[in-house]
Amino acid sequence: MKPTQAILAEILDEVRPLIGQGKVADYIPALARVSNQKLAIAVYTNEGEVIQAGDADEAFSVQSISKALSLTLAMVLYKPEEIWQRVGKEPSGQAFNSMIQLEMEHGIPRNPFINAGAIVVADLLQSRLSAPRHRLLEFVRQLSGDTHIVYDKVVAASEMMHSDRNAAIAYLMRSFGNFENDVIPVLNNYFHACALKMTCVDLAKTFSYLANKGVSVQTKKEIITPVQTKQLNALLATCGLYDGAGEFAYRVGMPGKSGVGGGIIAIVPGEMTIAVWSPELDASGNSLAGTQALELLSERIGRSIF
């Protein structure tokens, strides 16, 4: 079965009672102010069709979803060994901002989607691009077809003011020789990436290349190779949802990436990209109602990579 607007609207109605059972991220004040009632889903097919329900045209802070986009840019700019000698490909099983494992493993982060790994990717981008922030924004605008996408300066400033732990992570990696640039500019770029404001429709369009062997459905251009696409989807399936990746694979069965803004992107290779948004999070930092919506959609349309 193919997804329809009626199916999407029905799913949102079914998951709405979960609102009130999760917790909106409050360690970033600007995120804590977002209404917990927001609920959205959008599907972008490989034929270029958009199907949506709920608040799918309302922009929100994508947070860690941007880590998959930053990694995509790094994969374009670097040889594989240049990336993977500095960051691993394994699930961490730890909280996304944990430092214990990083110390034990000599400053090499487990994967590119926990904070430490994403900060290494930001460091890689800083080394190769004169204006990483501008390049990422340009990249996202092209992939989504939405020239109005911006960084939320309030969120970025808020994250910079509460950056002690991420700065500690960066300096710890530098002490092990796994950092090339000044920490503060790299963190600033990292926080701006997290502060991208996008809608579910924007996100579904932006990530269409992961459902289409590396070719953007929106621009018809190859972003990464089919092999790189397979590799990135594998990392999303194993590491994309913090320490809830196994649970997500079990329930939803799609490569995905979540953010503490309440968004999740999910990929059905060869067919479609799905974005959901509900700001309340579960204990792992993943959208509570969003995960349930993806599980229901996976069941209704009979799609899973497993």
Swiss-Prot record:
EC annotation from Swiss-Prot or TrEMBL: 3.5.1.2
Family of the protein in this entry: Belongs to the glutaminase family.
Lineage: Bacteria, Pseudomonadati, Pseudomonadota, Gammaproteobacteria, Vibrionales
The organism of origin for this protein: Vibrio atlanticus (strain LGP32) (Vibrio splendidus (strain Mel32))
Gene Ontology terms describing biological process: glutamate biosynthetic process; glutamine catabolic process
Pfam families assigned: Glutaminase
Major enzyme class: hydrolase
HAMAP family: Glutaminase
Protein name in UniProt: Glutaminase
Binding positions for substrate per the UniProt entry: S64, N115, E159, N166, Y190, Y242, V260
